Amino acid sequence: MAASCLGALRDLAVRTIRDCAFTKRASYFGKEEDTVVLLPSGDEKYLSFWVRDCAMMAESGLLPDRDLERYLSIVALCGQNGADTRFLENGLTVPPYAVADHINYDGCAVFFPGTYRSGTDQGNGSYGFSPPFCDNYFFILMAAQYVAQSGDVAILGKDFGGMTLTERLERAAYGYNIDRESGLCESAAGAYTVDWGFVDTVKKSGKLLMASLLRHNAHAALAKLCDAVGESVKGKQYLAEAHKIADNVRKTFYDDASGWLYSATGIGHQYDVWGTAYAVFSGVISKQRTLEALSRAYRGGTAVVNGYVRHIPADCNHSSASAWESSTTALDRYQNGAYWATATGWYAYALWRYDRTTDILTDFLAHTARFSAHGAPFEWIDRETENLSGLYYGTSGALPYIGALRIAAEGGSI
């Protein structure tokens, strides 16, 4: 990868993160005041503070310490349920210490996708009956990123609403709807839980790949945080849980015939492009057959177009009407067959692991340059870039750079 490529990706990440930062009149800290809020996109498509988007952009290391501390504080003070289960309308529940999907400017937490309502009516179950799994784990990853870049270990003992940050993180890590024997996240078919936010219009059941990978990464991060404050025994326990999850991910989701990982064991038992790439990026799997599957799909044009990544290989759609077995959106739109740059960095790392090539990143940069005046990088595009959405999208700008950083850190040609 040429130095100009790495530099261009960094510049794009900086610019996109800047485009996503808006000054809003908000009440996150007990009073209404003007404060900078990081939104998912530069066109304000989503008018709230999304926990996962912020955490994923933060992985770039490009958010200033003071800003990341503020966002972390917003989640700790406004975005986590208390000790009791909240029972909402239409059979929805918010488990103890669940973390919100997004937090409105008035400081009120919204635990379910598809709505800005923060009261008892947060949906009818079409976005799950428990909050998406992912935000508990992104809360932990956000905290770990802040401590890593700032060196501010003391924040872990700081009080946030009557609990230390460490206590809040540990309760988030325990999670809900977990198969305790395997450590994997599990969704009931009759009252399902959204896997994670970038497939919140997709219904899955059984054990879930992507949520379990996030749980693995969060436990590994929490182990390091425990070590940083001298809690080595507790750190070893969290690391052991991470190892258990990784072992069971490989046992449960890996398809030896193809090298792909399945997205779920029930509804949605399909090859998961994003999840497979993320498993490689997370160090959970490194099988040659898996790397070959990702390379073959890239070279064959079934998983990637212009550096953007599809959730399901295009030649593995569930039917002629839908990429996923169960989705609320039309084929080849949004999360049901469109192409996204959120997974580009993970995929780039996997391709580099296979044959030391990084063409996917240069493809992405070329497309971004061609459509920059139209709002690139986009949230998603179709194959022809005729249908698209989400302008100057935060994770589309930041995560390709994160993949490039990983390649460089492991000795990739820069």
Residue ranges and their predicted role:
Residues A2-F49, Y71-N124, S130, G175-G206, ...:
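Extended glycan-interaction surfaces of carbohydrate-active proteins
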Residues L68-Y71, G235, A242, T290, ...:
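Solenoid-repeat scaffolds in large eukaryotic assemblies
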Residues R52, Q122-S130, V153-M163:
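The substrate-binding groove and active-site-proximal loops of carbohydrate-active enzymes
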Residues L209-T252:
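Active-site neighborhood of glycoside hydrolase catalytic domains
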Residues L165-Y176:
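An active-site-proximal structural segment forming one wall of the substrate-binding cleft
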Residues T329-T357:
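C-terminal substrate/ligand-recognition segments
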Residues A55-D67, F138-G157, L214-E231, A277-R289, ...:
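Well-ordered alpha-helical scaffold segments within catalytic/enzyme domains
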Residues P131, D135-F138, M142, A211-L214, ...:
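Structural signature of alpha-solenoid helical repeat junctions
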